[in-house]
Amino acid sequence: MKVLILVLLGVVILQAAPIRKLEDLLPTRYPPEHELVYWCTYANQCDFCWECVHGICRNRIQADWPVIHQNDWIINCTVSRWNGICSYYEGPRNHTDHQMDCANPTSHTYPHREYMKIYERDDL
């Protein structure tokens, strides 16, 4: 439910200030800090969305997400924006490229709990 509210809030923010007004973004593995909410909503497996310390990872944007063990679910991503088209590339392992209208974004990733390796306090 909280994720849905976050997504709806993101859509409202995009409607108020469309991302098209932003400059083009050359392909990067490190999007600007002020754009992380946008990118991490639609590309939530990307490593720049997670902060990992000693193998335990927390989502940098969505505080209600579970704490997870660092694992292959978190992937290296490259994001870019050109002429109103936002892209993120899941690679190099997946070699998957997603493109979407920046003003009407769609998520191509979503949490598969069985792959996330959720951290439990009993794991200590």
Swiss-Prot record:
Q: Where is the signal peptide?
A: 1-16
Q: Which UniProt keywords apply?
A: Glycoprotein, Signal
Q: Which Pfam families match?
A: v110
So which residues have sugars stuck on them?
76, 94
- Tell me its family: Belongs to the asfivirus MGF 110 family.
Function, as annotated, reads: Plays a role in virus cell tropism, and may be required for efficient virus replication in macrophages.
Please identify the protein, giving its name as recorded.
Answer: Protein MGF 110-8L
Species of origin reads African swine fever virus (isolate Tick/South Africa/Pretoriuskop Pr4/1996) (ASFV)
